[in-house]
């Protein structure tokens, strides 16, 4: 109704971009007339105009026209009008929803080029290394042609290479690499180790998968902490000897223990130490954990012992949580109590969620085939609008209504017979399954029906094999079973993907002769596993096999084509030597050879000539087959279960009917499917029973379809609430993380940190005064002796300070006096240190500040984790757990900042360097502190 009154809001948004499209199209002729070098000179001209005060929006029409022309010359691909609109949506920092096959990858070149003109860097994020590499090589050619630098981040890269790649105008990377690099940069001990520049603009491909499906996944860098095993064992022994209510009290509600004075005396006597809190030999932490293990953690209630390991039991579900460990040394204390082998503690050194990582970008945009269903979440959490880009040609896909069966068995038999029926007509079929086990079950049924098919699931076949299967999934009579449509990077082209087939044929001849044996590959020597499993990659200890499945190719290549191919391989071997290149480098050469970018390299040119010839021969067959398949009705997609999110169902449907091709989809469901069982089961089951239907009879009823959609909405809302909660809690951590990382970066970059340390020292003096002097009490009740002792504990150089020096001063005067004293002492300390080695004091300042920030931040992360766990229970006490978490988390953070200050001041005054070691050793020798 509202749509009829006001028009579709999405259409209004898209309409807004129309005048710009007209403007770009008017520029087309003019830009086409430019020579290559004139076109390339445009980049410098645009940069100049930005310097002269024009904005990116002013440049947009001309810049887009230039990219469109460059892409036409280099890749032979010209942006459609709808792709220009997609580019504008991305430039405006929104999410562009574009259907499968509408060329998302090409769209990103437009805003990436425009935003890279500022020189601040653009990140294009994909979901896996293979897609990042493919896009950097393929689309990167347009940017390189226009004079921009293009970087690529891959899993095994060394820091120097990463630094170089991040310094480029446009960098392609995966979400996890960007996240881990961000965390590592914030653990660096000098600016030389920092690889990333400040974030500027980011385009996320498959944005729903990164910002929604993986939003709850934290990225964690952790380190093993070596702690002395014998301390845990000794502490367990002491805890056994201490008596409850005499030596300690147990607070069951807070799950904590408090030691009495008698307890401290007894424990110190048993251990033969004078102070449990002695920083040189700390025992308190171990003793407290040992008492907790004895009193609060019971075997077979809180944990079980299985195969010599302590396994946690979840108190809410009663399930064992394999692989989870209590933190803070508690797990070790329980291992000691049970007399088991004590394992190392692991400690979180740094962590961030994708939600917060991407919110660090001043401007963020994304593309996907399916975002509209999650629009509310994108807007609420990421402030990102979703705009649907119209398709270039109207869709001809038919979505048939769902068919529901009573049992799972009946459903699978129906799926198999549908495959057989459609296969008999010659139409290609794609079946999406939700698990490996189900895909193998269907494969078995199809084998019994003698239907040839390809199986694609998460078994360790590598990405290349996956893309190979998808590349031929559109051929006449092809049947493909795929789990969760993992190969989202390659399009299903009706009649077969000639381009991809030709590339695989070149690969068969080229790779065996040029790739070095695995034992010589530098990646292997470094002990780095290549991130590709078996299949066509190396599986451990196996011989590499480059041959594609023989059925893949549509026809034999001609003698002339084979001659060209053998010649190209000979040229490569002559240039580089037999079996001399690492696999990645050879893959890169192949990728560049199969694109259209101009090249000077004779090897690539020879490979390209062969590739083009083979592709042309294959195209004769695939084009004819394309027409046949279109006439038959295109690809038929079968879904075998509804996913937890409608979005993933839509991704599967979107495989059919791409770019205006015909196609159809249908979902087969059963009452035993997870989604229906968990979220809608009883209501639907009662409908079914009321209908008294045989199990092999399908049901199609509007009532049932509605119940299904409600079940799906329920699941979506449930997961959205979880993500929102994770986000709200993590928001607290995020503000703290930003503050501490900003402080850390200031220290890393700061040339002169002396003023900062003096400020720390003055604040520490103020803290000491506040602890010993209550301005509301008369001066004779002030504990000046304690105050002076505490000051001298921090600053031994003030040994001459006496209580009488402070006796007649007011609090502000006392502060001013101690500020002056501590400054003088610091100058004195500096003179001592500089006499040993000039410049050493500055290094020491940086080292101690970074060391304390890192050390206390790690501990703070653990405290925040513990707080988050305990705060959940406050809900029962009518308190809002989130409000409590924010309040207490903030207090913990302030405490940490104070501790950092005090420890730095203490460490610097205590610092006694040995006689002139080389400067590097100063920082590494105290690294453990």
UniProtKB/Swiss-Prot annotation:
What is the protein name given in its UniProt record?
Protein translocase subunit SecA
Gene label: secA
Enzyme Commission number(s) of this protein = 7.4.2.8
The lineage is:
Bacteria, Bacillati, Cyanobacteriota, Cyanophyceae, Acaryochloridales
List, in alphabetical order, the Gene Ontology terms for molecular function in this entry: ATP binding; protein-exporting ATPase activity
SUPFAM superfamilies reported in the protein's UniProt record: Helical scaffold and wing domains of SecA (SSF81886), P-loop containing nucleoside triphosphate hydrolases (SSF52540), Pre-protein crosslinking domain of SecA (SSF81767)
| Presence of keyword Ribosomal protein | no
InterPro entries assigned to the protein according to its UniProt record, in alphabetical order: Helicase_ATP-bd (IPR014001), P-loop_NTPase (IPR027417), SecA (IPR000185), SecA_CS (IPR020937), SecA_DEAD (IPR011115), SecA_motor_DEAD (IPR014018), SecA_preprotein_X-link_dom (IPR011130), SecA_SF2_C (IPR044722)
Mention any one GO cellular component term assigned to this protein in its UniProt record: cytosol
The lineage's top-level taxon is: Bacteria
Q: Which UniProt keywords apply?
A: ATP-binding, Cell inner membrane, Cell membrane, Cytoplasm, Membrane, Nucleotide-binding, Protein transport, Thylakoid, Translocase, Translocation, Transport
């Amino acid at each position: 109704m509202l749509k009829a009154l006001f028009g579709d809001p999405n259409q209004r948004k898209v309409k807004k971009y129309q005048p710009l499209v007209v403007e770009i199209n008017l520029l087309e002729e003019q830009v086409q007339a430019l020579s290559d070098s004139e076109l390339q000179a445009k980049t410098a001209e645009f940069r100049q105009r930005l310097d002269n005060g024009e904005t990116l929006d002013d440049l947009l029409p001309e810049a887009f026209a230039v990219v469109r022309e460059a892409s036409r010359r280099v890749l032979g691909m010209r942006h459609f009008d709808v792709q220009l609109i997609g580019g504008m949506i991305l430039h405006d920092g929104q999410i562009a929803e574009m259907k499968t096959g509408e060329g998302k990858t090409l769209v990103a070149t437009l805003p990436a080029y425009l935003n890279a003109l500022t020189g601040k860097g653009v990140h294009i994020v994909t979901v896996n290394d293979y897609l990042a590499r493919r896009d950097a090589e393929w689309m990167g050619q347009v940017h390189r042609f226009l004079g921009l630098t293009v970087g690529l981040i891959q899993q095994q890269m060394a820091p120097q290479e990463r630094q170089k790649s991040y310094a480029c105008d446009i960098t392609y990377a995966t979400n996890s690499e960007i996240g881990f690099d961000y965390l590592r940069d914030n653990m660096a001990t000098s600016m030389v180790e920092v690889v990333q520049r400040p974030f500027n603009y980011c385009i996320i491909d498959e944005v729903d998968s990164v910002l929604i499906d993986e939003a709850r996944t934290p990225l964690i860098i952790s380190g093993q902490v070596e702690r002395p095993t014998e301390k845990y064992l000794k502490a367990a022994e002491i805890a056994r000897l201490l008596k409850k209510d005499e030596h300690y009290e147990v607070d069951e509600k807070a799950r904590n223990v408090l030691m009495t004075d008698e307890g401290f005396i007894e424990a110190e006597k048993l251990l033969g130490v004078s102070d449990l809190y002695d920083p040189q030999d700390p025992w308190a932490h171990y003793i407290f954990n040992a008492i907790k293990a004895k009193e609060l953690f019971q075997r077979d209630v809180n944990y079980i012992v299985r195969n010599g390991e302590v396994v946690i039991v979840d108190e809410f579900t009663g399930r064992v949580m394999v692989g989870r460990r209590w933190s803070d040394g508690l797990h070790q204390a329980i291992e000691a109590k049970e007399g088991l082998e004590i394992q190392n503690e692991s400690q979180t050194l740094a962590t961030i969620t994708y939600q917060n990582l991407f919110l660090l970008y001043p401007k963020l945009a994304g593309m996907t085939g399916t975002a509209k269903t999650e629009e509310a979440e994108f807007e609420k959490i990421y402030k990102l609008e979703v705009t649907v880009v119209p398709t270039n040609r109207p869709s001809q896909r038919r979505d048939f209504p769902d068919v529901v069966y009573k049992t799972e068995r009946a459903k699978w038999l129906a799926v198999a017979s549908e495959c057989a029926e459609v296969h008999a007509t010659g139409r290609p079929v794609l079946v999406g399954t939700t698990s490996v086990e189900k895909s193998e079950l269907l494969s078995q049924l199809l084998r019994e029906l003698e239907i040839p098919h390809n199986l694609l699931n998460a078994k360790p076949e590598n990405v290349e094999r996956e893309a190979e299967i998808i590349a031929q999934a559109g051929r006449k009579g092809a049947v493909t079973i795929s789990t969760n449509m993992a190969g989202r990077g390659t399009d299903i082209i009706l009649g077969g993907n000639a381009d991809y087939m030709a590339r695989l044929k070149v690969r068969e001849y080229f790779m065996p002769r040029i790739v070095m044996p695995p034992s010589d590959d530098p990646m292997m020597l470094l002990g780095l596993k290549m991130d590709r499993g078996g299949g066509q990659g190396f599986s451990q200890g196996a011989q590499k096999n480059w041959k594609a499945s023989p059925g893949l190719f549509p026809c034999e290549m001609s003698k002339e084509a084979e001659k060209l191919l053998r010649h190209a391989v000979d040229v490569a071997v002559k240039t580089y030597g037999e079996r001399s290149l690492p696999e990645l480098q050879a893959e890169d050469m192949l990728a560049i050879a199969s694109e259209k970018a101009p090249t000077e390299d004779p090897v690539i040119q020879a490979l390209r000539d062969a590739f083009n010839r083979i592709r042309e021969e294959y195209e004769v067959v695939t084009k004819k087959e394309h027409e046949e398949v279109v006439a038959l009705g295109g690809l038929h997609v079968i879904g075998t279960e509804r996913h937890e999110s409608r979005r993933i169902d839509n991704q599967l449907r979107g495989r059919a009917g791409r770019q205006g091709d015909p196609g159809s989809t249908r979902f087969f469901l059963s009452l035993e499917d997870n989604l229906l069982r968990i979220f809608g089961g009883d209501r639907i089951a009662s409908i079914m029973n009321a209908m008294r239907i045989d199990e092999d009879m399908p049901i199609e009823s509007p009532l049932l379809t509605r119940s299904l959609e409600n079940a799906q909405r329920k699941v979506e809302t449930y997961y959205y609430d979880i993500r929102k909660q994770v986000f709200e809690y993590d928001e607290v951590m995020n503000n703290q993380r930003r503050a501490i990382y900003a402080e850390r970066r200031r220290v890393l970059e700061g040339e002169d940190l002396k003023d900062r340390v003096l400020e720390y020292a003055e604040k520490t003096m103020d803290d000491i005064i506040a602890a010993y002097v209550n301005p509301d009490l008369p001066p004779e009740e002030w504990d000046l002796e304690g105050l002076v002792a505490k000051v001298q504990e921090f600053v031994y150089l003030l040994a001459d300070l006496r209580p009488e020096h402070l006796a007649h001063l007011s609090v502000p005067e006392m502060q001013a006096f101690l500020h002056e004293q501590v400054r003088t002492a610091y100058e004195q300390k500096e003179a001592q240190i500089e006499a040993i080695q000039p410049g050493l004091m500055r290094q020491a300042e940086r080292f101690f500040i970074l060391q304390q920030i890192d050390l206390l931040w790690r501990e703070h992360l653990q405290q925040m984790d513990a707080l988050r766990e305990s705060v959940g229970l406050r809900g029962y006490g009518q308190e809002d757990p989130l409000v409590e978490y924010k309040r207490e988390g903030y207090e913990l953070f302030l405490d940490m900042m104070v501790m950092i200050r005090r420890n730095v001041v203490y460490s610097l005054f205590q610092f006694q360097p040995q006689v002139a070691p080389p400067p590097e050793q100063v920082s590494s020798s105290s690294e453990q502190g």
